[in-house]
Amino acid sequence: QNENIKLISNEHICHELINTYQDDGIILEPAGVLSICALDKIPQEHLKNKNIVCILSGGNNDVSRYPEIMEKSLLYLNKKHYYIIEFPQKPKQLKKFIFNVLGENDDITRFEYIKKTNKSFGNVLVGLETSSSEIIENKMSDNNFKFKKILESDLIYSYLV
């Protein structure tokens, strides 16, 4: 691989689409932000005291896709995470999860009861927006919630994102 060629993830592109829209009010197409994304891949010391030109292109973007773009941006920023969580089949478990696991600024963005696996437990697909998945995971463990984080390499990930 040529060191001058930069690989840009879909999530990074989505992040920059959101940034240019929110910060500058510019609606670009995904290909239009590639030059901005590439700048993030170049060490800052190589850019110092140089004139840099980025070509931005197109408003050829369907605004109805912005919720999907926003989600991919949050994934890129490591602020959105998906889990399969085993909830005990007894009263007040969701309340326990909300009060003991979630922080003040954490948010449940998806909650799907998958199925009761037995009389004692049921699996739930949970999407969380959080600034620290590590803290969430530690709190889930501390509160005896069994869970599996859904990773990009998991087959179900492409279904969710």
Residue ranges and their predicted role:
Residues Q1-V161:
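PLP-dependent amino-acid enzyme catalytic core
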